[in-house]
């Protein structure tokens, strides 16, 4: 497959993923509205009762009434251990057991967190892979071109351009007497191997 075709296929894949992500968002809009909205910003969690009760709204957390807060319940410095649980919004003066919807909230909050959807994560991963592959191809072609431009190295040409092989004018060098083989008739200390039997 040619490199131009690869880039076209990659662009088509990225485009189809983007369209797929937009289709998912449209489907989410067609779902009926839930009676609660949860907003998390930093360590603050805000629960909104969408029944439009205004100041007549009463909140209950795990069976205990919360202070008067209207249709919005602010939970600053949210603690996952202490403030997670069942929340219910109901009209003041009515029984919370009669409320049609309950909310189970378990959230993890932090100071500098960012919420990312699946499409953002998928886009980051795909772009990272594309950049990595692009750098790999760049280094590959750069090293291939550099290798082709380099001068070939011939062996033996370093000594003034002389050819290899034995020079007919000069005899072979005399062997070094320090490395002569041991003579068979010689009985020196180191003239033979130690043949001690155990």
UniProtKB/Swiss-Prot annotation:
The name of this protein is T-cell surface glycoprotein CD3 epsilon chain
Cytoplasmic topological intervals: 139-198
* ITAM domain segment(s): 169-196
Matches recorded under PANTHER family: T-CELL SURFACE GLYCOPROTEIN CD3 EPSILON CHAIN, T-CELL SURFACE GLYCOPROTEIN CD3 GAMMA CHAIN / DELTA CHAIN
Region ranges (Proline-rich sequence): 170-177
Q: Fill in the PTM field for this protein.
A: Phosphorylated on Tyr residues after T-cell receptor triggering by LCK in association with CD4/CD8.
Which GO terms fall under biological process for this protein? adaptive immune response; cell surface receptor signaling pathway; positive thymic T cell selection
- Supply the Gene3D superfamilies for this chain: Immunoglobulins
Quaternary data: The TCR-CD3 complex is composed of a CD3D/CD3E and a CD3G/CD3E heterodimers that preferentially associate with TCRalpha and TCRbeta, respectively, to form TCRalpha/CD3E/CD3G and TCRbeta/CD3G/CD3E trimers. In turn, the hexamer interacts with CD3Z homodimer to form the TCR-CD3 complex. Alternatively, TCRalpha and TCRbeta can be replaced by TCRgamma and TCRdelta. Interacts with CD6. Interacts (via Proline-rich sequence) with NCK1; the interaction is ligand dependent but independent of tyrosine kinase activation.
| Functional summary from the UniProt entry | Part of the TCR-CD3 complex present on T-lymphocyte cell surface that plays an essential role in adaptive immune response. When antigen presenting cells (APCs) activate T-cell receptor (TCR), TCR-mediated signals are transmitted across the cell membrane by the CD3 chains CD3D, CD3E, CD3G and CD3Z. All CD3 chains contain immunoreceptor tyrosine-based activation motifs (ITAMs) in their cytoplasmic domain. Upon TCR engagement, these motifs become phosphorylated by Src family protein tyrosine kinases LCK and FYN, resulting in the activation of downstream signaling pathways.
Where does this chain mainly localize? membrane
Effect caused by changing residue 72 to Q = In allele FN18-
Record InterPro entries: CD3_esu/gsu/dsu, Ig-like_dom_sf, Ig-like_fold, Ig_sub2, Phos_immunorcpt_sig_ITAM
Tell me the gene name: CD3E
Ig-like domain location is 37-107
Annotated organism of origin: Macaca fascicularis (Crab-eating macaque)
Q: Where is the signal peptide?
A: 1-21
Q: Where is this region: Disordered?
A: 152-198
